[in-house]
Amino acid sequence: MSDRSSVEQEYLESKLESALDDAWSKVNIALDKTSKSSADVAMGIWFAAEALEYSSLLFNLTYGLEDVKPTIKLRKGEVALVLVKDSMELLKRAREGRKRSVADAYVNLRTAADFLKAAHLEQVRKSNKKRE
C-alpha cells in the first residue's frame, strides 16, 4: 500500500466490501438463471462479469496490486453452468482469503471474472446458433 491515509484506506475497503457483496448477488442470480435455462441467461452472466470486473478494479486500488498480473487459464468449450459455479467458488475464496493473502484473493477474483466472460461468450454463441 502507498502513502494512503487510514481514512482513505477504510473508505476503499468499505467500497470494496460493497462491490464484493454486489458481485456475489449478481453471480447468484446468474447461477439461478443458468441452471433454469432462463431466456436472459447471457445478460445475467454479463451483469455478474461486470460486477466482478468492478470489484477487481477496487481490489487492485485498495491493496495496491498494480504489479500482480495473474495468469488465467481459460477453459474453452466448458458449459456456462460449470463456469458460473466455478466463478462463484472463486469469488467465495477471494472474499474469505483476502485476510490471508490479498494477492491470492486477487488472482481468484480475476479468474472468476474471466470465467464469467467466457461463460457469457459461450451463452451468446449458443443463442446465435439457435437463431440460425
Task: Label the predicted regions.
Residues 1-132:
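Long, charged/polar, soluble alpha-helical segments
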